């Protein structure tokens, strides 16, 4: 980003003089960098009273060299900062030497500072001052920022020094007390619970006062809530000293003293995964604090925390970028995971997108210089652990974890930047890990030299205390007294806890709660007609694509012709919920149009490109808002974001849609660690809806299966709902049921692709205006002759319509749709089975291979439903390694085989059993 010719340092005085003469004859004949250089030199000549600057090429060379050196200090100064508390020398950079720029230290004194834009002194004075700024305590990387205003802000702020000032006497004492608490807690836990894992903060203790400063600065800038995400390292200290968890609560986690639990919902989690909510007073302002719970899957909490922050900003009034200061997100990373885990850049990529931005996140890397047993040389391909962030134009501040002054100054600078530009900012805190990966691990096995240094190195509290002693602020005796005061306090709390009898877990355990009745989901026909009319109104002069206009116009009559398709039913469901005051948010790849062009929630003017979102124009007197966004091409980060949003906004209907259901497994950690187990582990609740296009239509092994079997395998304790609606009306009702339920679980919906416009699957207005969602749908076509049915076939949506289209008239086969697979509708299925007195067998038919789909899950359920009195048969694809055929002809043949086998007459040799087996 130099403002001077990059090559002047290698040119001799004569060349510079020749170039200057050419510039004087015709400024356009030389490069702009030379023109700027000569303008500066001429200004210098005027200030010094010299004759034309070209008459003194040596002065030109010195000025150019000084300017280039100053530019290099801003650019490379971070490489000269002493960052490692253990003493590793900084690498430096040859560009930081005057000689590299064709000038000596002595010659710097020949250049007036005024020639470089400074008021007094010489270039030597300027260079000395800037070395103190950029090569001193904070290593700043900012020249990669594309926005010149941001670069100039950092230059001005760093060089003026208001935000990087040293701590005051009171602040230094407060930091000493804080570091004493942080260090004292870890030492006490090591003694009281020797051998327990706690993933201590020791070596980067300064993280706690840094977060303290971020909360204070955020509050002063208008924040009223702080949302945090972090891994296990240092979490116990953050829980107690930042979030406000009492020492008694923390000791209870070590002692196994659980709080109130219910018999059917809580298995709990280890203490260093726990979330927490607290608050803190900053002056007269109360700041809400929330630490998101997280699994051991490093960095996967990042998008979850971002989604929570976005939801809180929306609820606090933030919309379209307004009031983003109300919620400050803070994300704590590890030095090995930050460059190693793909979810990190995925989440950074969300930071500037309209559907996901949160007005900037404060990122802090807790840099231990080792990942478990892996050295940085094997952990990353970059110099700094933080380097991936630079690709997203995130400024980076590097600090030494033993220098609390620098660390807190970096926080001031970072929060001020975030407040000014509403962008992400990162602080890399270089420290060490006093113990192994956990306290039972021996790190000297793999890092013997490093841990010899660690063993000899004083703790951050000792380093800071010694500094204050050397400055005459406190005495050694006072430092020791502060330490003893805290040790006595925490010991007394521990003994008091030990003396308090533990309540019986059985006494605390409450009875399992019964599921609440389903809410009414039908909507009056007049209301649906009104919504439909509004959704088909365009702004004056708006030009819709002619083909799309015809498609949407069909929706005007569909309510009366019985042709409501999938996208239409969804729009009516969303519209009715908005009128009920329920916010709706949907995102996913191509979600605005829909992968299969079935939604068109956002329409585009073909002449101007202006967009119109009909659902966003519905009357909002009760507060319902509609958001829909095309997501970036990411599953893990976007699903994680929407999950986090759903936990923070529990009354909103939040949906994530996969482009194809096959791609949902890219986000498997979000499903396994959060969606399916959050309530059991952390008592956290989410009503997130996953829309997963699923169905075998010849698309091959990557465009057929949403891996239904994996979701069913995760189901237990009513932790989620897994459904496969067979009609638009069913889809309408289950969406409304999900939004209106008082106690929601995540909803996983298989979306039948080929049914989106299938006439046989269309719904009528009456289907939406009456009734509700049906878990199981009996075969109405055989209702008047059930006694003639020999084979009862249970299946899901897509399979049902394939069978229905091929079933001959008078067949003795009944087709029953199971639209809700979990919770399994056992009573309803058993009731249907009982209505067919002459059954000879029950078939589960599916498109998926036998080792996939629902078969393994439903087989034991069907044995219960039939009382083990009927033969249960499987018909579908055989067990396979790949979910579907890659050739369309093979697909068609297999599909025909399945249909034919299902619809064959039931074998007469198999009779209904007369007793249970």
Identify the residue ranges that each predicted region occupies:
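Subset of Sec-pathway N-terminal targeting signals
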Residues: 1-40
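Extended, charge-enriched "interface" segments that sit outside catalytic cores
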Residues: 4, 44-206, 223
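Flexible, glycine-rich loop/tail regions that form catalytic "lids" or insertion modules at the edges
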Residues: 61-71, 78-108, 113, 125-128, ...
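Active-site pocket-lining segments that scaffold enzyme catalytic pockets across diverse folds
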Residues: 184, 188-248, 550-557, 564-578, ...
């Amino acid at each position: 980003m130099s403002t001077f010719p990059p090559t002047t340092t290698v040119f001799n005085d004569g060349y510079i003089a020749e170039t200057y003469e050419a510039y004087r004859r015709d400024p356009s004949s030389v490069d702009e960098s030379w023109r700027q250089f000569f303008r500066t030199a001429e200004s210098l000549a005027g200030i010094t009273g010299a004759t034309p600057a070209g008459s003194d090429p040596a002065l030109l060379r010195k000025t150019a060299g000084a300017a280039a050196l100053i530019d290099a200090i801003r650019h490379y100064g971070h490489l000269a900062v002493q960052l490692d508390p253990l003493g590793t020398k900084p690498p430096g950079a040859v560009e930081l030497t005057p000689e590299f720029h064709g000038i000596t230290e002595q010659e710097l004194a020949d250049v007036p500072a005024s020639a470089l834009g400074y008021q007094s002194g010489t270039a030597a004075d300027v260079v000395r001052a800037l070395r103190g700024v950029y090569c001193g305590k904070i290593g700043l990387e900012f020249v990669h920022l594309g926005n010149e205003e941001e670069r100039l802000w950092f230059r001005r702020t760093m060089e003026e020094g208001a935000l990087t000032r040293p701590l005051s006497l009171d602040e230094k004492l407060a930091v000493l007390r804080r570091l004493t608490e942080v260090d004292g807690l870890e030492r006490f836990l090591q003694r009281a619970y020797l051998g327990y894992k706690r993933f201590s903060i020791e070596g980067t203790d300064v993280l706690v006062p840094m977060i303290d400063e971020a909360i204070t600065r955020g509050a002063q800038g208008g924040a009223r809530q702080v949302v945090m995400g972090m891994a296990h390292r240092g979490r116990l200290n953050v829980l107690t000293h930042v979030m406000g968890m009492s020492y008694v609560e923390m000791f209870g986690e070590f002692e196994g003293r659980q709080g109130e639990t219910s018999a059917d919902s809580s298995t709990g989690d280890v203490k260093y995964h726990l979330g927490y909510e607290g608050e803190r007073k900053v002056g007269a302002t109360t700041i809400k604090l929330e630490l998101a719970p997280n699994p051991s899957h490093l960095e996967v909490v990042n998008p979850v925390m971002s989604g929570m922050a976005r939801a809180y900003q929306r609820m606090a009034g933030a919309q379209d970028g307004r009031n983003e200061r109300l919620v400050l997100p803070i994300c704590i990373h590890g030095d090995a995971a930050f460059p190693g885990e793909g979810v990190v850049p995925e989440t950074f990529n969300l930071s500037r997108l309209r559907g996901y931005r949160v007005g900037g996140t404060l990122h802090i890397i807790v840099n231990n210089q080792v990942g478990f047993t892996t050295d940085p040389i094997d952990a990353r391909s970059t110099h700094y652990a933080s380097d991936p962030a630079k690709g997203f134009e995130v400024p980076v501040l590097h600090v030494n974890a033993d220098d609390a002054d620098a660390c807190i100054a970096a926080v001031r600078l970072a929060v001020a930047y975030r407040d000014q530009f509403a962008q992400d900012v990162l602080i890399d805190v270089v420290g060490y890990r006093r113990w192994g990966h956990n306290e039972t691990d021996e790190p000297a096995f793999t890092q013997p030299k490093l841990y010899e240094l660690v063993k000899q190195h004083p703790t951050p509290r000792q380093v800071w205390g010694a500094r204050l002693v050397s400055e005459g602020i406190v005495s050694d005796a006072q430092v020791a007294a502060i330490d003893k005061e805290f040790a006595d306090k925490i010991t007394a709390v521990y003994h008091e806890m030990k003396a308090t009898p533990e309540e019986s877990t059985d006494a605390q355990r409450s009875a399992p709660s019964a599921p609440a009745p389903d809410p009414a989901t039908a909507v009056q026909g007049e209301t649906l007609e009104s919504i439909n009319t509004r959704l088909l109104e365009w702004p004056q002069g708006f030009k819709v694509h002619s083909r799309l206009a015809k498609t949407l116009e069909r929706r005007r009559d569909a309510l009366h012709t019985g042709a409501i398709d999938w996208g239409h039913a969804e729009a009516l469901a969303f519209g009715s919920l908005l009128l009920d005051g329920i916010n709706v948010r949907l995102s996913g790849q191509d979600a605005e149009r829909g992968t299969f062009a079935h939604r068109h929630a956002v329409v585009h003017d073909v002449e101007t490109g202006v967009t119109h979102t009909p659902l966003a124009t519905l009357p909002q007197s009760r507060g319902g808002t509609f958001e829909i966004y095309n997501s970036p091409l990411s599953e893990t980060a976007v699903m994680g974001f929407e999950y986090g949003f759903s936990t923070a906004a529990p009354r909103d209907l939040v949906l994530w849609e996969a482009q194809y259901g096959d791609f949902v497994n890219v986000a498997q950690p979000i499903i396994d660690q959060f969606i399916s187990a959050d309530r059991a582990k952390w008592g956290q609740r989410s009503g997130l809806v996953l829309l997963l296009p699923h169905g075998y239509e010849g698309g091959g092994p990557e465009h057929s299966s949403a891996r239904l079997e994996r979701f069913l395998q995760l189901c237990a304790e009513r932790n989620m709902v897994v459904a496969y609606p067979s009609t638009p009306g069913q889809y309408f009702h289950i969406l409304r049921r999900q939004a209106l339920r008082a106690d929601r679980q995540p909803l996983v919906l298989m979306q039948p692709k080929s049914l989106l416009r299938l006439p046989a699957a269309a719904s009528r207005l009456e289907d939406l205006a009456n009734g509700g969602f049906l878990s199981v749908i009996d075969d109405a076509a055989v209702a008047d002759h059930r006694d003639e049915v020999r084979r009862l076939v249970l299946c899901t949506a897509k399979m049902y319509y394939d069978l229905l289209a091929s079933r001959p008239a008078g067949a003795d086969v009944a087709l029953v749709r199971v639209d809700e697979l979990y919770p399994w509708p056992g009573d309803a299925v058993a009731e249907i089975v009982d209505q067919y007195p002459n059954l000879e067998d029950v078939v589960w038919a599916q498109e998926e291979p036998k080792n996939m789909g629902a078969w393994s899950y439903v087989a034991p359920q069907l044995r219960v439903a039939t009382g083990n009195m009927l033969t249960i048969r499987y018909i579908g694809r055989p067990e396979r390694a790949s979910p579907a055929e890659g050739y369309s002809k093979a697909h068609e043949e297999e599909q025909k085989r399945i249909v034919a086998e299902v619809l064959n007459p039931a074998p007469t040799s198999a009779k209904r059993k007369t007793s249970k087996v």
